[in-house]
Amino acid sequence: MLYYLYEHFHINIFHYITFRAILAFFLSFFITIFIMPKFISWAKAKATQPIFELAPDNHKTKNSTPTMGGLIYITSAVISILITTEFNKYVLLTLLLLVYFTYLGFIDDYGKIKGSSNKAGLSAKTKFLLQWVGALVISYLLIKVGFDTKLYVPFYKYPIFDMGYYAVIFWAFIIVAMSNAVNLTDGLDGLATVPSIFSLFTLGILLYIVGNYKFSSYLFYPFELGVGELTIIVFALIGALLGFLWYNANPAEVFMGDSGSLPLGAVIGFLAIVAKSELLLIFIAFVFIMETVSVILQVGSYKTRGKRVFKMAPIHHHFEMLGWKENKITIRFWIMALITNLIAILSIKIR
């Protein structure tokens, strides 16, 4: 909306991505800050979080905490995005992805609330299938709008090969994997929120580079016209997440629920694809990947050997079972996320 003020009235400041990104940050932050208390008051009576029966004992006290807070911060971010961005093909695809995965998460959350059980809601198979459907459609549309299908690796400036239409499957895998990875990480107060902010900030830098001809040429990144607008989406999400963290910090007044974690992970995966940094996710999303790998190892070991690798998975529960306090686990995971994202940022120049 603001970009079109520049086009029609020549208000030059609205032309700059940096200005609109900062504005998007503040808009989504304050919308979330002001709306969330009203949502929490309503959700205390209508939408509390059912706690998994096998969760550590200290989680039982969280049974009355409202969930679906993700609906508020995603809505705040979308409002901010609609106000501050130029609607190009990448912006529209990102919005479509956000809306689809938020709706999918909402259906799952709603089922759990109505069923009064963490096992209610969508079945794992149904949710997984619907995630793949959405991810495949978005990935296919990304190719149809002419996006480059070459694959790049960290610390190397040239593409290793062109994936062609196989990119649809690879990109869909990235989106689904990240969606579930953030969902698995969202088990402690603030645990998924801050690493998501770090990941988004790193992706914001990468997207700005890929969308800027001078910077992309200097740093040997492929140039993609229009990708720079996604930097604004990144800052809208960061602002919304910081507003959410105000209420999600320990002791949490609200949880993001699948309504927040599924779209958040999906958009991190999608933005990494558009930033030509899919494989750099090993650093950008290290904490999320670590949590996911811990679950894969636990399930695989139990099914093949009848033994568990960890006391409980995802791995943050393992540390809880060892007697670590929730805040200590959360802050240490935040530190890991910060360090690995700094490595990812360093890789921009070391290529």
Curated annotation (Swiss-Prot):
Q: Which domain of life is it from?
A: Bacteria
Q: Where in the cell is it found?
A: Cell inner membrane
State the PROSITE patterns in the record: MRAY_2
| Record has Hydrolase as a keyword | no
- State which Enzyme Commission number(s) the record gives: 2.7.8.13
GO MF terms on file? metal ion binding; phospho-N-acetylmuramoyl-pentapeptide-transferase activity; UDP-N-acetylmuramoyl-L-alanyl-D-glutamyl-meso-2,6-diaminopimelyl-D-alanyl-D-alanine:undecaprenyl-phosphate transferase activity
Which BP terms from GO are recorded?
cell division; cell wall organization; peptidoglycan biosynthetic process; regulation of cell shape
Q: Which cofactor does it need?
A: Mg(2+)
GO annotations of cellular component type: plasma membrane
Major site of localization recorded for this protein: membrane
Its keywords, alphabetically, are: Cell cycle, Cell division, Cell inner membrane, Cell membrane, Cell shape, Cell wall biogenesis/degradation, Magnesium, Membrane, Metal-binding, Peptidoglycan synthesis, Transferase, Transmembrane, Transmembrane helix
The EC category is: transferase
Bilayer topology: Multi-pass membrane protein
CDD domains, per the entry: GT_MraY
Q: What's the catalysed reaction?
A: UDP-N-acetyl-alpha-D-muramoyl-L-alanyl-gamma-D-glutamyl-meso-2,6-diaminopimeloyl-D-alanyl-D-alanine + di-trans,octa-cis-undecaprenyl phosphate = di-trans,octa-cis-undecaprenyl diphospho-N-acetyl-alpha-D-muramoyl-L-alanyl-D-glutamyl-meso-2,6-diaminopimeloyl-D-alanyl-D-alanine + UMP
The protein, known as: Phospho-N-acetylmuramoyl-pentapeptide-transferase
Q: Which organism is it from?
A: Nautilia profundicola (strain ATCC BAA-1463 / DSM 18972 / AmH)
